[in-house]
């Protein structure tokens, strides 16, 4: 594309500037590169210091090198291209920085500064550490000096303190060694300090060396700035030159634009001239049209004059026949009277005949009337069936037609698809492609060969076209041929045409609009006539066709604009994509416009205001260009400008705009834009003109509207008033207006027209004759019909008769066709003109309707107005309907209402009404009321005569005052039945100038004003103070009119429910009211109440009551629960207050269907205290068919009474099973007639619906009101189960269906009422199965109800359930209070009678008989009224099917199942908003441990939307978790039970109980091993890894120098899958002589909760024969292994070190003596079982080392072991203890038997009570030998018998505890290993110790095992008697031996 001169000049200027900028950039880069090279060649400070030459020497050397052309080593002498202004090279003054880069020099300087700071910090740190080390050395020296002083003092002390001297010496040695080490540290710190100081000094020196670089850096920067300023000045000069050249070019362009503007102005002048010429032509056409219209108006006036003359003639003809018609009518009336008289006579005769025949004439007549009514009903039903059959047939026809249309549509679609596939399918496309290739290639081939090495040239392969090919220059014949292929309806699309051809295309408006090209037709063919007798099918078809045409036209108009510019269907954007799109639009808008701010205010909105706001082109003509100007006004704060960006592309061919660039407009200044519209099709357009201002885009709406017809009818109903006299006519008009510009044709028609009347529309020659004949014929037919008794006929039938009979002779003449303008519609006396015509745009047509009645009857005509547009024949226009109504009358004077009905009238009241008399004639007439003598005094007419003016009315006032004498005076006017007391009195108005009188009828019904009250007196009985007691009062209205009554002047405490004593009672209705009374004081009270009515009547009722103070009162008797959503629970509470000095028992009887729970509902209130009772309301879901709203509320908060209630307190009339009382006589028995044989009262006439349901059986009441009846009750009992129970009557008890309790039988009479015992239902299998089935059914019901609630989102959101419940609280009388033991246990007292259902009544009777007349009074009652309201929740949980519902708690249960501890599981729940407002969700706080938690934040939920809540479960311990999640909105709380179990990694160890008993490895020789097997099983549902870990108990006495564990496990770790087991081998290998080895094996599992600990025990011996059980002495502590090393080396330690044998022995004895104190096990580790010896083995863990030390000290001394008796004894008791001896069997060396010799007990020991009881082979002194086989182990049992009385030599005799000691010597022989004692064996002494307590054992203290109580004293003498006595004692069974 070639550039203009201006563009080329600008390109050249900018190219030069780019070259200069590139040269400057290259120069700067070269300078920087050379600076870097010079910096690399600079020597460092260390190099300069190494050369030993200062900086000045280096500068001189460089200068000399530069002069001589040489360079020093390491420095490259390259010239620098950067020169100063004087041509000199810029250089730095300092030697090391000569020619260096400034930036690099800066960085180097910063690095040096950082190094100095770092060295300074290190120096400070090292200095601080050196100071600390110096202080420490000084302190240590001072401490050593003080120790030296103390050593000198100790040396001088007498006697010397050797131990202190040794300690001081040791401290001196330690402190001296530490001092030497600290001094070495101090020396190192000093050296480090010197090093840090040297580094700091070096860094400071280098910093000083670099100090001059700062000045040189500044100088270099100044030189660089000067160079840049010079370059900028050069660039500015070049820019000035470019600007000058651009200004010259701009001036040339302005001159060119001026020339263009001049040319445009010439073109505009030529257009204006053409427009003026077109306007002149239009004026001429308008003048011609106006002339034609005037001619049409003149011809119309002539036609109107002719029509008026014709109508005058017709009216004159009608007036001539008026006299004949009147005579005929009079004759017909006389005939009718004669026939009526004859009929009455015949009826009277038949009446007499029937009476004589003994029949009831009324019955016969009534049966005849009923048969006639049945016949009429049968006829109506038959007609209805026929109509329904027609409708069904029509529906079937419509369905068949729709089905046929669907089949046709499918066939058309299939055919279209086949044609498309045949013409546009792949095969057709391939064929067309091949044909095209064959026609346009040289060789006629369908494909070119692309495989050649050289591509073919197009000129060689294809046919060469002319230069006009593809440029719109095709020959005309080719274009015509293509257009013929497309068809006549196809037009070129303007959008696809070139711009120069768009305005020249000639399009057909009708074709484009899709309205057809059919030729014109007349009104019959084009508009058609409505059907004469249209059937339902035809009407529906016509309506459907019109709707389809309207919808298709609207769819065409809607899609007309979119057809030009279609858009591909795309998917809907997601929320994220919409956000991105909005952000992009915001960024785009910010880029194209900036906000305007003036003086701190930012302008918002569009900156320009168009005037007019909408550019509208109305009623346009296709092809005619219309222009509109719009002013664009700047309304912003500052100057602004705009430009037009265009019009949408789909409307560019019809809309255009023109404007001048406005420049910047000041605020308030406007610019003009001219919009031109050239319509090419009658299509509505809605678009806008897009403009862009500095502040952003804005638009001007454009609306283009075609010509349309807006038709309306006013009025739609034409009424001719009260009536028109026969022979006269009345005229009314209605108007059809067209508020649009489209001209339409209208036609009036009626479906009531007959064929002849339709033909009459087009004829005018015999119209008058036909009308006259029709009138005469109609009158004759009416007379004949009246004479024959057929009754009057309709106007349509008269017209048909006239046309059919009278017009027949004239048919031969042939009717003449009238012009369209003269056609009139006539039917039934109505004539409408005109009925056909044209309605131009913005005009209206007035239609004249004339009504000339031919019969005295009402007439009605329905007119249909249809329209069509001649210019748009396919346009469907709406139809209108006009209703014409009129009435024909015989005489001119008539009454407006022939029946004056006073309705129902009360006796003694005055009533008025008006009789309006109208005169339809042409002259005034006199009227008089003909009086009746029997009406005198009752009816009065004022005035009784008067004159009625022509066309006016005359009112006559009628006054009526009925009295009781009226019915007697007017008894002949009473109509049947006489009980109704209805009077119908015939009256007449006499008109002298009129031959016929005017009849009218007076009608009235008489009634009285009485009210009946039942009972006539109110007895409230005993009334509890503080609450209201109610009785029922029936108010009955015997009259026939409703009455309004009210009880006035009520005394204090009396209240009526409802409406506070005011009411409205209907005729014959018995209205029930609850009269409640709250006594203000205690005691009997008498008063009366008065009721008054609006009729002026007053009635008085006497009342009496007795006030009673209750022992327990409620804090509030009324409770209103808040509106509770279904699934939620609301809680309130009341307080029971006991004001007496005795405890009071109570029970609440809660209705079963109330959804209320009271807790506790049964209990006791302590004296002078309060008890809180909680009331929970959990509404159940609605059931199917349940209506919303409130049921009839209970009548009163207390019990209603019957009319015959006598004494006694009131009871509640509600659903709790309580009822009214009976009246008792003096003997306490019910009066006769008060109850039936079953003990029920007759209260059916006074029970409210709520009293029918008996909920919960109350405490102390019978089973009549329980939840279910007894099994043996019959139907009558079931029906009466809900009646009000009677106090004092016995009834069979019933079991509660809920299974919670069964009621006790009710006691009879007033002889006593026992409180009911609460019994639990037996827990058997059948009961469990039934309970489970009932629970499952309840759960299914609740789930179904919840689903209904969730599906009620589209239902009524205002559903609610309001109920009111009265709950009775029974207070047990004080005489039946429970015993103190029962009060303490908190149980309710039980009745003495059995509570089973079979014997309940008999037991109750027996109890009543036994109690006698002195029985306690019945329970007192107080009442609580609770109002509840249940609503639908707005927050609903969309629970999945697997989420169970708990009906008891009314919530879903989300079970996470077992989850490993520490693992997190997340579940999703979906909440839905079923309300009408957005919900803000919230949640109540949960457990702080965060086991259950909400993962996501709660967001607001829109109406109808849902929200997902994620709940997590993270167990922290191995336990079950249960928590309630409460999600709440403003009105609803949604409870969700969260359940889960934390399962820790758990392993099961086997054998069973191994963790408690442990593993006993047995007795093992040192060096050998023993093994046991342990089974580890994974019982968790996931794999587990485990590790075996030994606690490794250590002892100071046995330091384990070999570092070997006695116990080991294999495998020590592993991983087990779910259910997998593994065997672990535990080995025991003793490493030294230790009698007892103990350890704890811990099985470690990751994340375990409970420790798995297995105690391990074993015994290691170096010798085969051993003694197990006693405590071995503790060895001497050897922390430094001196004894062990000396024993290994065979060197004896000096006594000062070893402590000597005596010391060792003493230490061992002391340790043994201290062995009583048991060791405390480690926390969390279960201590092993205590051996029979009783002493703990924790402190004897190193017994082998003690034994070795004892053997080394002296082998001749026997080892002493300690055997402690496990329990202390008292005098006279016997205690036993045992230990084991055994011989080992070696696994390597075989086995050998052994022997243990037991020395004989000394005599003093036997006398003291010691004995050897086991083995029994011992002698009298206890001595003997115990043979031991290899591997055998035997027990030896010792017993001690305490003396019955301690002798004075014993410590116990003085009241202190003491230890009794026996030393038993054992000799160990044999075995595998050689004993240390030689052939004689090894001696072992067992010291047995038993603790003896003074006194005797307390009586309550049990005897421990192993202790025998003191026997009976036995007389004995001699020293051997005690021993003998001991021998005779039977030893107790040996305690279980300790497994070691």
Swiss-Prot record:
- Note whether Repressor occurs among the keywords: no
Q: Which InterPro entries match?
A: Ig-CFAP74_3rd, Ig-CFAP74_4th, Ig-like_fold
Compositional bias (Gly residues) spans? 1205-1220, 1260-1271
Bias kind Pro residues: ranges: 1720-1731, 1896-1912, 1930-1940
Return the GO cellular component terms, semicolon-separated.
Answer: axonemal central apparatus; axoneme
Sorted alphabetically, which Pfam families does this protein's record hold?
Answer: Ig-CFAP74_3rd, Ig-CFAP74_4th, Ig_CFAP65_4th, Ig_CFAP74_1st
Coiled-coil parts of chain: 100-159
Q: Where in the cell is it found?
A: Cytoplasm, Cytoskeleton, Cilium axoneme
Q: Where is the composition biased (Acidic residues)?
A: 1227-1236, 1272-1282, 1321-1335
Q: Name one GO biological process term.
A: axoneme assembly
For bias type Low complexity, the affected ranges are 63-90, 535-548, 1287-1304, 1373-1414, 1913-1929
Keywords (alphabetical) are: Cell projection, Cilium, Coiled coil, Cytoplasm, Cytoskeleton
Region Disordered: start-end pairs: 52-90, 512-548, 1159-1336, 1373-1418, 1714-1737, 1894-1940
Which family is this sequence assigned to? Belongs to the CFAP74 family.
Function comment? As part of the central apparatus of the cilium axoneme may play a role in cilium movement and thereby cell motility.
The family database entries (NCBIfam families) matched by this protein are listed as: choice_anch_D
- Describe the subunit structure: Part of the PDCP1 complex composed of CFAP46, CFAP54, CFAP74 and CFAP221; the PDCP1 complex binds calmodulin.
UniProt name for this protein: Cilia- and flagella-associated protein 74
């Amino acid at each position: 594309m070639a550039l203009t001169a201006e563009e080329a000049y600008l390109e050249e200027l900018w190219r030069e500037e780019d070259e200069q900028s590139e040269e400057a950039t290259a120069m700067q880069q070269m300078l920087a590169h050379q600076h870097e090279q010079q910096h690399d060649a600079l020597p460092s400070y260390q190099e300069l210091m190494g050369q030993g030459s200062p900086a000045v020497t280096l500068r001189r050397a460089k200068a000399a090198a530069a002069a001589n052309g040489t360079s020093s080593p390491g420095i490259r002498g390259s010239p620098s291209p950067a020169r100063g202004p004087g041509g000199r090279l810029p250089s730095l003054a300092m030697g090391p920085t000569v020619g260096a880069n400034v930036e690099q020099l800066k960085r180097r300087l910063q690095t040096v500064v950082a190094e100095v700071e770092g060295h300074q910090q290190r120096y400070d740190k090292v200095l601080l550490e050196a100071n600390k080390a110096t202080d420490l050395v000084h302190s240590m020296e001072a401490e050593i000096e003080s120790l030296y002083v103390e050593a000198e003092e100790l040396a001088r002390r007498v006697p010397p303190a050797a131990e202190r001297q040794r300690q001081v010496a040791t401290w001196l040695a330690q402190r001296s060694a530490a001092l030497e080490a600290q001094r070495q540290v101090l020396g190192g710190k000093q050296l480090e300090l010197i090093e840090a100081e040297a580094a700091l000094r070096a860094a400071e020196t280098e910093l000083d060396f670099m100090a001059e670089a700062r000045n040189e850096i500044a100088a270099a920067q100044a030189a660089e700035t000067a160079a840049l300023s010079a370059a900028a000045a050069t660039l500015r000069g070049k820019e000035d030159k470019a600007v000058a050249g651009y200004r010259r070019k701009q001036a040339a362009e302005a001159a060119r634009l001026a020339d263009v503007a001049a040319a445009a102005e010439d073109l505009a002048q030529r257009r204006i001239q053409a427009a003026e010429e077109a306007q002149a032509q239009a004026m001429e056409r308008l003048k011609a049209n106006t002339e034609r219209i005037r001619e049409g108006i003149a011809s119309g006036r002539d036609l109107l004059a002719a029509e008026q003359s014709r109508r005058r003639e017709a009216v004159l003809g009608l007036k001539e026949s008026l006299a004949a018609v009147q005579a005929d009518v009079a004759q017909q009336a006389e005939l009718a009277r004669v026939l009526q008289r004859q009929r009455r006579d015949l009826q009277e005769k038949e009446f007499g005949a029937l009476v004589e025949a003994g029949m009831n004439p009324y019955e016969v007549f009534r049966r005849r009337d009923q048969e006639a009514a049945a016949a009429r009903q049968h006829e109506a039903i038959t007609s209805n069936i026929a109509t329904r059959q027609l409708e069904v047939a029509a529906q079937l026809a419509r369905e068949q037609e729709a089905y046929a249309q669907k089949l046709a549509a499918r066939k058309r679609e299939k055919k279209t698809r086949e044609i498309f596939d045949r013409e546009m399918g792949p095969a057709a496309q391939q064929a067309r492609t091949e044909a095209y290739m064959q026609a346009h290639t040289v060789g006629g081939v369908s494909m070119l060969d692309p495989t050649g090495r050289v591509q073919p040239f197009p000129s060689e392969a294809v046919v060469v076209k002319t230069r006009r090919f593809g440029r719109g220059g095709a020959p005309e014949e080719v274009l015509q041929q293509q257009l013929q292929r497309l068809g006549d309806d196809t037009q070129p699309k303007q959008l696809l045409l070139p711009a120069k051809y768009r305005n020249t295309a000639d399009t057909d408006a009708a074709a484009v609009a899709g309205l057809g090209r059919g030729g014109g037709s007349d009104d019959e063919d084009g508009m058609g006539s409505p059907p004469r007798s249209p059937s339902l099918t035809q009407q529906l078809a016509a309506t459907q066709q019109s709707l389809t045409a309207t919808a298709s036209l609207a769819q065409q108009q809607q899609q007309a604009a979119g057809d030009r510019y279609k858009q591909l269907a795309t998917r809907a954007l997601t929320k994220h994509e919409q956000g991105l799109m909005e952000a992009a639009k915001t960024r785009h808008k910010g880029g194209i416009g900036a906000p305007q701010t003036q003086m701190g205010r930012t302008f918002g909105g569009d900156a320009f205001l168009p005037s007019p706001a909408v550019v509208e082109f109305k009623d346009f003509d296709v092809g005619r260009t219309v222009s509109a100007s719009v002013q664009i006004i700047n309304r912003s704060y500052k100057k602004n400008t705009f430009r037009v960006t265009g019009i949408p592309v789909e409307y560019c061919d019809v809309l255009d705009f023109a404007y001048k660039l406005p420049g910047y407009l000041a605020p308030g200044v406007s610019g003009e834009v001219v919009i031109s519209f050239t319509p090419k099709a009658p299509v509505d357009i809605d678009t806008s003109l897009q403009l862009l201002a500095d502040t952003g885009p804005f638009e001007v709406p454009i609306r283009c509207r075609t010509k349309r017809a807006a038709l309306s009818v006013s009025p739609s109903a034409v009424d001719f008033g009260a009536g028109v006299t026969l022979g006269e006519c009345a005229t009314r008009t209605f108007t059809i207006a067209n508020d649009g510009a489209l001209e339409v044709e209208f036609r009036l028609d009626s479906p009531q027209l007959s064929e002849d009347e339709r033909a009459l529309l087009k004829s005018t020659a015999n119209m008058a004759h036909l009308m006259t004949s029709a009138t005469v014929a109609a009158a004759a037919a009416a007379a004949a019909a009246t004479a024959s008794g057929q009754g009057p006929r309709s106007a349509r039938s008269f017209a048909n008769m006239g046309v059919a009979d009278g017009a027949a002779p004239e048919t031969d003449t042939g009717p003449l066709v009238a012009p369209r303008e003269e056609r009139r519609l006539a039917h039934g006396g109505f004539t409408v003109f005109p009925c056909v015509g044209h309605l131009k745009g913005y005009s209206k047509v007035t239609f004249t309707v004339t009504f000339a009645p031919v019969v005295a009857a009402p007439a009605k005509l329905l007119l249909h107005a249809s329209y069509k547009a001649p210019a748009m024949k396919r346009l469907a226009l709406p139809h209108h309907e006009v209703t014409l109504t009129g009435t024909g009358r015989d005489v001119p004077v008539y009454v407006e209402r022939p029946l004056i009905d006073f309705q129902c009238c009360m006796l003694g009241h005055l009533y008025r009404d008006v009789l309006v008399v109208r005169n339809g004639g042409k002259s005034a007439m006199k009227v008089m009321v003909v009086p009746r003598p029997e009406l005198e005094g009752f009816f009065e007419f004022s005035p009784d005569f008067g004159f009625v003016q022509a066309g006016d009315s005359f009112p006559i006032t009628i006054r009526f005052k009925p009295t009781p004498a009226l019915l007697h005076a007017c008894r002949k006017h009473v109509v049947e039945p006489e009980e109704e007391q209805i009077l119908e009195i015939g009256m007449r108005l006499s008109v002298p100038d009129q031959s016929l009188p005017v009849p009218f009828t007076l009608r009235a019904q008489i009634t009285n004003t009485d009210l009946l009250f039942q009972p006539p007196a109110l007895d409230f009985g005993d009334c509890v103070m503080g609450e209201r007691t109610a009785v029922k009062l029936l108010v009955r209205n015997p009259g026939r009119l409703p009455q309004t009554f009210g009880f006035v002047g009520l005394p204090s405490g009396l209240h009526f429910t409802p409406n506070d004593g005011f009411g409205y009672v209907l005729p014959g209705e018995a209205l029930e009211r609850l009269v409640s009374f709250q006594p203000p004081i205690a005691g009997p009270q008498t008063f009366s109440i008065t009721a008054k009515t609006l009729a002026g009547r007053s009635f008085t009722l006497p009342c009496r009551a007795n006030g009673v103070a209750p022992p327990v009162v409620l804090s509030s008797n009324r409770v209103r629960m808040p509106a509770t959503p279904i699934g939620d629970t609301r809680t309130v509470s009341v307080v029971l207050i006991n004001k007496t000095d005795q405890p009071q028992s109570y029970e609440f009887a809660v209705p079963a269907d109330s959804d209320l729970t009271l807790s506790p509902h049964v209990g006791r209130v302590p004296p002078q205290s309060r008890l809180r009772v909680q009331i929970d309301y959990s509404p159940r879901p609605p059931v199917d068919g349940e209506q919303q709203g409130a049921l009839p509320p209970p009548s009163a908060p207390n019990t209603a009474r019957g009319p015959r209630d006598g004494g006694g307190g009131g009871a509640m009339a509600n659903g709790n099973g309580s009822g009214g009382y009976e009246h008792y006589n003096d003997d306490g028995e019910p009066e006769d007639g008060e109850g039936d044989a079953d003990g029920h009262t007759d209260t059916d006439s006074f029970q409210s619906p709520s009293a029918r349901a008996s909920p919960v059986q109350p405490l102390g009441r019978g089973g009549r009101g329980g939840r279910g009846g007894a099994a043996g009750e019959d139907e009558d009992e079931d029906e009466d189960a809900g009646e009000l129970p009677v106090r004092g009557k016995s009834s069979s008890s019933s079991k509660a269906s809920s299974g919670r309790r069964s009621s006790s039988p009710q006691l009879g009479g007033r002889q006593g009422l026992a409180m009911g015992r609460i019994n639990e239902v037996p827990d058997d299998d059948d009961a469990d199965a039934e309970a489970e089935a009932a629970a499952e059914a309840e759960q299914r019901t609740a789930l179904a109800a919840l689903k209904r609630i969730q599906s009620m989102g589209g239902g009524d959101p205002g559903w609610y359930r309001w109920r009111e419940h009265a709950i009775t609280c029974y207070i047990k009388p004080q005489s039946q209070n429970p015993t103190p033991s029962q009060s303490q246990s908190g149980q309710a007292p039980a009745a003495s009678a059995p509570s089973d259902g079979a014997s309940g009544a008999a037991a109750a009777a027996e109890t009543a008989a036994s109690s006698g007349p002195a029985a306690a009074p019945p329970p007192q009652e107080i009442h609580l009224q609770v109002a509840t309201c249940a609503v639908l929740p707005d927050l609903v949980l969309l629970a999945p099917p697997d989420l169970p519902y708990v009906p008891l708690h009314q919530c879903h249960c989300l079970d996470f199942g077992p989850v490993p501890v520490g693992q997190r599981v997340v579940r999703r729940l979906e909440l839905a908003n079923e309300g009408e407002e957005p919900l803000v969700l919230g949640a109540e706080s949960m457990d702080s441990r965060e086991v259950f938690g909400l993962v996501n934040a709660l967001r607001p939920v829109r109406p109808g939307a849902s929200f997902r809540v994620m709940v997590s479960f993270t167990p922290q311990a191995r336990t079950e978790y249960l928590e309630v999640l409460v999600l709440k909105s403003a009105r609803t709380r949604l409870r969700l039970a969260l359940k889960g179990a934390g399962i820790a990694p758990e392993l099961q160890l086997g054998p069973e109980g191994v963790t408690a008993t442990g593993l006993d490895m047995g007795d093992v020789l040192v060096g050998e091993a023993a093994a046991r097997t342990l089974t580890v099983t994974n019982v968790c549902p996931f794999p587990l890894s485990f590790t075996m870990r030994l606690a490794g108990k250590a002892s100071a006495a046995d330091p384990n120098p070999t570092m070997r564990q006695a116990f080991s496990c294999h495998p020590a770790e592993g991983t087990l899958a779910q259910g997998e087991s593994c065997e672990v081998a535990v080995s025991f290998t003793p490493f030294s002589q230790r009698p007892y080895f103990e350890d704890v094996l811990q099985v470690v599992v990751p994340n375990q909760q409970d420790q798995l600990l297995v105690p391990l025990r074993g015994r290691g011996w170096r010798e085969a024969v051993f003694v197990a059980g006693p405590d071995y002495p503790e060895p001497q502590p050897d922390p430094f292994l001196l004894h062990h090393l000396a024993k290994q080396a065979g060197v004896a330690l000096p006594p000062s070190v070893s402590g000597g044998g005596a010391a060792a022995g003493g230490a061992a004895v002391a340790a043994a003596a201290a062995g009583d104190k048991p060791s405390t096990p480690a926390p969390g580790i279960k201590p092993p079982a205590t051996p029979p010896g009783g002493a703990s083995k924790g402190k004897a863990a190193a017994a082998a080392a003690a034994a070795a030390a004892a053997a080394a000290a002296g082998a001749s001394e026997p080892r002493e072991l300690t055997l402690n008796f496990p329990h202390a004894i008292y005098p006279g008791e016997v205690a036993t203890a045992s230990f084991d001896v055994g011989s080992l069997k070696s696994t390597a060396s075989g086995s050998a038997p052994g022997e243990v010799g037991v020395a004989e007990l000394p005599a003093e020991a036997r006398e003291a009570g010691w004995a050897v009881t086991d083995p029994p082979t011992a002698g009298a002194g206890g001595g003997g030998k115990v043979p031991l086989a290899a591997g055998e182990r035997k027990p030896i049992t010792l017993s001690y018998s305490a003396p019955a009385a301690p002798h004075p030599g014993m410590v116990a005799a003085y009241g202190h505890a003491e230890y009794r000691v026996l030393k038993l010597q054992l000799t160990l022989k044999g075995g595998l290993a050689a004993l240390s004692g030689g052939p004689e064996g090894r001696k072992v002494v067992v010291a047995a110790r038993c603790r003896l307590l003074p006194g005797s054992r307390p009586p309550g203290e049990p005897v421990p095992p192993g202790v025998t109580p003191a026997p009976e004293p036995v007389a004995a003498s001699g020293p051997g008697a005690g021993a003998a006595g001991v021998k005779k004692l039977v030893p107790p069974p040996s305690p279980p031996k300790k497994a070691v």
